[in-house]
Structures are given as C-alpha cells and as structure tokens.
C-alpha cells in the first residue's frame, strides 16, 4: 500500500495583490505537483491568485473585531494544524511585531517551520534585537531567502546558520505564447503594489519627466492597487504628465499587459527578489531598474537583458529609459536575451530545490 503524502501548510497574509502573496500561491501549485498534500491558510479574506490544495480562510472563520480577532485566528490556526496532523509549515507572512510572533511560536510548537524572507528590509521579518530574534527563532530554525543578498545579510546580522537561498520561480502562465499587439500607443510599464515608501513613485515619475519619452510618444502605465494611488495621481498632476501617464487597476494575471510593453521599470527603495523583474523578463520584455537591495543585481545583466542604474538618481534612471528606447541595437539585444536570462528560474528547477529541502526535513523527523 502506498504511503500517505506528506502534509504541508503554507501560512500567508492573503492570496492577493503583493508579490510575496503571489509566491505563496505559486508554492501551493508547485507542492501539489510534487505530490504533497497542501493546505493554504490565509489570515485575511483576500483571495485573487490561483492556488492549489485545500484553503482554510481565517478571514471568514473569525467574525470578531480588534485584538480578540487576532487571538481567535491564532487559536483556530493551531487547532487546524493539530487536527490535520500537519508537521511542516511554511510561514510566508511579514513578522515585525514581537508579541504577535510570541503567539505564533506557541501556534507552531513542535512543528518544523520554514520562515520565508521576502525582503532585504529584515526588520519586516526579524526583530531588530539580536536577543529577541534568537528567542523567537533558534539556531535550528530554517530560513529560506529569496535572494543571495538577503541570505548573506541574515547570517551577517543575526548569525543564524540554517539559511538557504531559493529563488522565486517563473509562474506557469508566463510561459504562454506571445500575444498580438492591440495597443495603438506604445508604452513602458510599472506594475506592483502602489506603495510609495517601497516602490518610490516619486523617483519613477521624475525620471520619466526628465527622460523626454512623453515627447517621443511613449506613455508610462502604472498598474496595481495600494494605499498611494491618490498620491501618485497628485504627483502626475504636479509634473504635468496627466496626458502621458495612466493608472491601471491591479490584475491577477497581468501578462498580456506586460508583453505589450516596450520595457518595464523598477524604481524601488528596497526589494527582496522582485517578481515584476522576473515576470517581465520571462515574457521577453527588458527591464530598466535601479540597483536597490536586493534582487535586481541578481537578475539584470546591464546591457544584456536590461539596464541597471544607481538608486535614488532620477537623471540616471531617465537616461537609461531614454537609451533603451532610442538605441535600437541595444533594445533588440536585451529583448532577445530576456527570456533565456531567467531560464534558471524555471518551475522545474525551483521545484527540485524545494523538494530537496523538504525531503531532508521529513527524513529527519519521520
């Protein structure tokens, strides 16, 4: 008789909007393909991305408000993990609040937990205090960082030993065939969460203004949802770009819009392993990006599949945008190299790396 499949729980804030949340959805698909029994546990009732496995939506299960709501969610999560006999948990949440993580330490008691690290801004995931971080996470805690730079920074700052880099994979649906161009006006594209503190739209819009691309007939489209949509619109008006910049709503499958862009742009203060860059290159669209910590430098070979420029420099970003638009030979080279530059992020390759890690964990505890 065949043995029952190993069980995995993926705990995520939601399955909507953010790059980390999309990664959680992609992991659920990947683990189901590997034959694991997958349980996706969403803290909030926000479900947009395609996922596989059994969904436990705590946002629906708990109806109370305030701090009591958070406590009830934690209790229900612990009960669910116990009732389903789940021994391995992948925690995909941000973890900035110490006392909340004390509660989750109790929730995860006697289980193998893999803590995802999606951002170079480590305080979003680990307490700034070395002592408190080591109280929450022992030296045997397994961390998976989505970039080499993040993994190195965790080891340097905290001294944790079990830190592994596994890049985010290219989603299945980016591997579709090219779509015919339907847009009459050419454009460049930013896509992601509309959060100025992270994505730095001020820099993006200033650079676009300086680049002169609006005069050349190349529009800028900004696609996504988030708290700073009104701020971005105000900046567009102040820079007198209202006729040249369009804000598009978030799309759970944005790849047609990406494919039709001439190139995409990233202007972030910080990242982890920016899926916007991965997804753009995967559909053959070059990227102009600032060299923020971390991720772009591990994805973009400047002059080969896009252009990488110093961060917080509007003129440098503007010059790169103008260069990729006007230098036909450079553009064609970057476009031709884009897809093959992320072949190492294929679903098959990343799936094998995850399977190897999980098999080691299960073999130790079976």
Please describe what each predicted stretch is:
Residues 286-290:
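Short hydrophobic beta-strand element within catalytic cores of glycosyltransferases
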Residues 269:
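Aromatic "clamp/platform" in nucleotide-sugar-dependent glycosyltransferases that forms part
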Residues 301-303, 307-314, 322-328:
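Conserved acidic donor-binding segment of nucleotide-sugar-dependent glycosyltransferases
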Residues 91-98, 117:
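Short His-centered aromatic/hydrophobic patch
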């Amino acid at each position: 008789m065949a043995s029952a499949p190993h069980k995995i729980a993926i705990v995520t804030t939601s399955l909507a909007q953010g790059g980390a949340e999309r990664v959680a959805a992609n992991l659920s698909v990947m683990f189901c393909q590997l034959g694991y029994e997958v349980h996706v546990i969403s803290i909030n009732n926000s479900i947009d991305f395609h996922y596989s496995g059994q969904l436990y939506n705590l946002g629906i299960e708990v109806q109370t408000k305030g701090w009591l709501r958070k406590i009830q969610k934690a209790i229900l999560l612990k009960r669910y993990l116990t009732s389903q006999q789940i021994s391995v948990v992948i925690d995909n949440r941000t973890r900035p609040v110490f006392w909340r993580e004390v509660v989750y330490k109790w929730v995860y008691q006697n289980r193998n937990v893999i803590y995802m690290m999606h951002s170079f801004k480590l305080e979003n995931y680990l307490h700034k205090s070395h002592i408190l971080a080591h109280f929450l996470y022992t030296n045997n805690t397994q961390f998976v960082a989505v970039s080499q730079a993040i993994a190195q920074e965790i080891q340097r700052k905290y001294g944790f030993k079990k830190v592994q880099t596994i890049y985010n994979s290219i989603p299945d649906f980016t591997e579709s065939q090219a779509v015919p161009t339907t847009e009459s006006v050419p454009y460049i594209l930013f896509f992601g969460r509309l959060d100025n503190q992270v994505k730095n739209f001020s820099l993006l819009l200033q650079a676009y203004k300086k680049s002169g691309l609006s005069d050349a007939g190349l529009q800028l489209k900004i696609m996504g949802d988030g708290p700073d949509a009104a701020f971005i619109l105000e900046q567009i008006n102040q820079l007198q770009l209202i006729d040249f910049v369009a804000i598009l709503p978030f799309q759970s499958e944005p790849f047609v819009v990406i494919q039709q862009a001439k190139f995409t742009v990233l202007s972030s203060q910080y990242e982890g392993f920016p899926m916007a860059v991965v997804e753009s290159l995967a559909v053959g669209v070059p990227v102009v990006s600032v060299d923020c910590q971390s991720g772009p430098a591990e994805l973009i070979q400047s002059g080969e599949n896009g252009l990488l420029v110093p961060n917080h420099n509007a003129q440098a970003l503007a010059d790169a945008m103008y260069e990729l638009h006007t230098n036909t030979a450079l553009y064609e080279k970057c476009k031709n190299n884009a897809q093959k530059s992320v072949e190492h992020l294929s679903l098959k390759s990343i799936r094998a790396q995850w399977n190897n890690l999980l098999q080691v964990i299960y073999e130790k505890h079976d």
